[in-house]
Amino acid sequence: MADEGSSTKDSESFSVLNWDQVSRLHEVLTEVVPIHGRGNFPTLEITLKDIVQTVRSRLEEAGIKVQDVRLNGSAAGHVLVKDNGLGCKDLDLIFHVALPTEAEFQLVRDVVLCSLLNFLPEGVNKLKISPVTLKEAYVQKLVKVCTDTDRWSLISLSNKNGRNVELKFVDSIRRQFEFSVDSFQIILDSLLFFYDCSSNPVSEHFHPTVVGESMYGDFEEAFDHLQNRLIATKNPEEIRGGGLLKYSNLLVRDFRPADQEEIKTLERYMCSRFFIDFPDILEQQRKLETYLQNHFADEERSKYDYLMILRRVVNESTVCLMGHERRQTLNLISLLALRVLAEQNIIPSATNVTCYYQPAPYVSDGNFNNYYIAHPPVTYSQPYPTWLPCN
């Protein structure tokens, strides 16, 4: 009986795609995506179909068996529900492979870099281009994770419009999603086999069976959340620090919590994890700036709204910080928001804007002087210490 229950539970996480969904998947896989080179390196014109087939065949030639290949992230969500509010920015591909030693990690990296040679324009002397050169020219991000629960690597190919092609090679990973709406993976093997073996084009009456999986566990429930723009998750304590940024991104796109009572607990978990993973203010700034660049490349108008939502969540749900640390992060978010407005010429200059923040509790003390008068800097001819003793 236990086996039957487990089998039923597993089957709930899978669903067969209909023709409209297969058609959108075909469009995503065959769309030409530019990979922009740094410096004088030419732009590579690739399709996901071609890069997957090239990398997969080269991996298997090198002795690394690919268990399956999947489309992940917002691209998978776009295939399932076209106008879902998330768009189709990320082009994430997952290759399930065995990575028992460092040698396999290195081999995977070399295979991907050498595969890029296939996409260089005609006339380029490929013999003089090394894998290291290709990495410097076309790779936006290179990640390797080796822990007791996670063994995977990521190679992100650069696109100036934020549509990076991300190739993820996974041996094991503890958690593959943050919220139900980003938990979908579409297994590509049947369609890739069709491309290789069929002389007929994909059509409504002649296409392979394609299966999707929700890592959330219940495909229909997650699909309903995606259709109706609902925010839900499982085991929120496992969500990494970036979950707070993704949650705020969902809110700015008019997603709403599926359960209003649980959302405050979820927000507190995410705020705590964000400050655990990014304890330093400079780390927080880098993370926020990178997130804005990657997820709002063509949505300048949404950046300010996003930062204000993030600020509200941090202000209301942060319980793990000293007061000054919390205020420091809130001020960082406010300054980033002002910079966004200045870049959009909505205000003339961020330096001419006064920031107001909620006073600390000790301001209510009658002996506390709540006025600080800023004087213009004075130039001294002799060296003068930059610190003053505290009274």
From Swiss-Prot:
Pfam families: NTP_transf_7. Coiled coil: none annotated. Disulfide bonds: none annotated. It comes from the Eukaryota. GO terms for biological process: in utero embryonic development; mRNA stabilization; negative regulation of cell differentiation. It is found in: Nucleus; Cytoplasm; Cytoplasm, Cytoskeleton, Microtubule organizing center, Centrosome. It catalyses: RNA(n) + ATP = RNA(n)-3'-adenine ribonucleotide + diphosphate. Transmembrane segments: none annotated. The keyword Translocase does not apply. GO terms for cellular component: centrosome; cytoplasm; nucleoplasm; nucleus. Its EC number is 2.7.7.19. Keywords: Cytoplasm, Cytoskeleton, Nucleotidyltransferase, Nucleus, RNA-binding, Transferase. InterPro entries: TET5. Its main location: nucleus. GO terms for molecular function: poly(A) RNA polymerase activity; RNA binding. Belongs to the TENT family. Catalyzes the transfer of one adenosine molecule from an ATP to an mRNA poly(A) tail bearing a 3'-OH terminal group and enhances mRNA stability and gene expression. Can also elongate RNA oligos ending with uridine molecule, provided that the sequence is adenosine-rich. Mainly targets mRNAs encoding endoplasmic reticulum-targeted protein. Interacts with BCCIP and PABPC1; the interaction has no effect on TENT5C poly(A) polymerase function. Interacts with PLK4; this interaction leads to the TENT5C recruitment into the centrosome. This is Terminal nucleotidyltransferase 5C.
